[in-house]
Amino acid sequence: MLLLPSAAEGQGTAITHALTSASSVCQVEPVGRWFEAFVKRRNRNASTSFQELEDKKELSEESEDEELQLEEFPMLKTLDPKDWKNQDHYAVLGLGHVRYTATQRQIKAAHKAMVLKHHPDKRKAAGEPIKEGDNDYFTCITKAYEMLSDPVKRRAFNSVDPTFDNSVPSKSEAKDNFFQVFSPVFERNSRWSNKKNVPKLGDMNSSFEDVDAFYSFWYNFDSWREFSYLDEEEKEKAECRDERKWIEKQNRATRAQRKKEEMNRIRTLVDNAYSCDPRIKKFKEEEKAKKEAEKKAKAEARRKEQEAKEKQRQAELEAVRLAKEKEEEEVRQQALLAKKEKDIQKKAIKKERQKLRNSCKSWNHFSDNEADRVKMMEEVEKLCDRLELASLQGLNEILASSTREVGKAALEKQIEEVNEQMRREKEEADARMRQASKNAEKSTGGSGSGSKNWSEDDLQLLIKAVNLFPAGTNSRWEVIANYMNIHSSSGVKRTAKDVISKAKSLQKLDPHQKDDINKKAFDKFKKEHGVASQADSAAPSERFEGPCIDSTPWTTEEQKLLEQALKTYPVNTPERWEKIAEAVPGRTKKDCMRRYKELVEMVKAKKAAQEQVLNASRARK
C-alpha cells in the first residue's frame, strides 16, 4: 500500500483509478547497507553481535575524529608556498599536538576543516585578498595534506620531524638519576623501531633477564628511520635519464651517510646508558661474588684431588726414576764396553801397523836402492790403510818368523793382492762412469759442445758452483751455467742441460774416482803455485791423532741461531764474535767467523750470477 502525504491548503485531491494488470514474476537484486552487512557477516563467518561490535568501533573512531580539536597555526598565512618543504605539515593542518599519532581519518578530517576555512574561493567571497596561482598560502595546506595522506611520504617526513629531540644524555647527566634521565629518551626513540613490543628500561628491581633483553634489543636496534625527505635534489626535475641517475646516486650516498650517523647516535645512547646503569654494576658484583665462591670451592676440591694425585705421582716418579737409572746404567756400561772394545781394536790395528812398518824397516824395506825403497814404503803404507787386523797380524807373523826372502815374497804377494783389488775397483768405477756418460749423452741428444771436453778445472768449478747455489735458488741451473761461463778458462759455453747432465753423472761416480779428481786438481794447484813435494826418504812419517778443525756441516737450527746472534750483536758491540759464539752452542768463535765469511761470499756470488742471467734474458727479449 502506498501512502502519500495530504494535500496542502488550496490544492485539490484527485483520485485516479487504473486498471490493474495481472501479476508477473520478476528478479530483484539485493542492495543497500543492510545487505552489505549481511554479506560481511557471511564472509567472516561472524554473528550479528560481532558486526555490532565492528560498527561500534567505527562509530567510536568517527566520534573521536569529531571530538578532535584542531590547533590554529598562527604563522599559517605568513608561510611561503615555495618553501613548503621546510614547513611543519602537522602544524599547518592543526595537528601539531598529535603529530605522528594522528590517524588517516584525523588527517582527512583536519584537511577538510582547513579547506572549508581557508579555501581561496571562500576567502574571496568574504572579501579577503587572494594571491594568484600557487603563491597563495592555501598551497601550503594542499602540500601538507599531500605529504601526510601518502604513507610513504608521511614516513619520510616523520623521520625528520623537526620537533623530535635527537639529543643523547651524557654520562655525567645520568650519574645520580639514571632512570629519570634515560627512560624518556628510550621511550621517544622507540618510535623508530621496526619491531613492536619495544622493551622498557625498567627500574632497580628488574631481573637480569629483563635488563639483558633490553640492551640486546637496543644494541641490535632495527630502525625504519630514513632521510629521503632531506634530499637536496629531486629526481623528478631531471631533464634526462643520466641526470636522474646521477641525482639518485647522490641522494643514496647522502641518505646512507645520515643513516650511519643515526645508528651511531643510537649506539652512543645505548653505550652511555649501559656504562651508567647501576643494575649492570650490581649484576657484575653479584657475578663476581658468585665466581669467587665457585672458584674457592673448585680450588678446595682441586687441592684435595691434587694432594692425592701428588702422592701417587711421587710414587710413580720414584719407580720410573729407579727404572731409568737402571736402564741408563746398563746403556752406559754397554757403551763403555763398546768403547773399550773399539779402543782395543784401534790400538791393536795401530800396533800391527807400526809393527809392519818396523819389520819392513828392519829389512831395509827389502830394497837395495833409494828409489825402490821409497816405492816399497808407499806400498807398505797402502797395506796399512787397506788391510784388516787379521791380515796385518798374519803378515807380521810371517815377517817375524821367516827369512828375508820368504818375508819379501809374502809382502809382495800381499801388495799384489791389494793392488789387484784396487785395480778391479777402479775398472768397475770407470765402467760405471762410462755408462753414466753414455746415458747422459743420450738424454741430452748426444751433441753440443757443452756435453764434451770437461776438463779438471771445469769439474772443480762445477762442484764449487753446485755447492755455492744450493737447491731452492731461483733458476738454479741457469745461474750455475752462467757462473761457469763467466769463470771457466776453457772457453766452452755450457747450457743448463749440460750442467744438469754432468752433475748427475758426477753423483754416480765411485768415491775413489772422486778422490782421483780432487787429487788431480791438487796436483795441478801445486804445479801452478810451485809447491814442492816433500818426502822423508829416511823413514815413513808417523801420524798423530789430535784435535782437528770442526768441519761438521751447519744445521738449520745453528744457522737460525747464528743469524739471530748477528742481529742481536751489531758491528759496534765489544767482543762481538765471542758473544755470538756463546749464542750458538757447539760452535767456536772461528767457526762463526768462517761461516759468516762463507755466507757473505755466497750472497755476493749469487747476486752476480743472477744479475748476469737477468741481463742475458733482457738481451734476448
Curated annotation (Swiss-Prot):
Keywords: Acetylation, Activator, Chaperone, Chromatin regulator, Cytoplasm, Nucleus, Phosphoprotein, Repeat, Transcription, Transcription regulation. Component of ribosome-associated complex (RAC), a heterodimer composed of Hsp70/DnaK-type chaperone HSPA14 and Hsp40/DnaJ-type chaperone DNAJC2. Interacts (via ZRF1-UBD region) with ID1. SMART domains: DnaJ, SANT. This is DnaJ homolog subfamily C member 2. Acts both as a chaperone in the cytosol and as a chromatin regulator in the nucleus. When cytosolic, acts as a molecular chaperone: component of the ribosome-associated complex (RAC), a complex involved in folding or maintaining nascent polypeptides in a folding-competent state. In the RAC complex, stimulates the ATPase activity of the ribosome-associated pool of Hsp70-type chaperones HSPA14 that bind to the nascent polypeptide chain. GO terms for biological process: 'de novo' cotranslational protein folding; DNA replication; negative regulation of DNA biosynthetic process; positive regulation of DNA-templated transcription; regulation of translational fidelity. GO terms for cellular component: cytosol; nuclear membrane; nucleolus; nucleus.
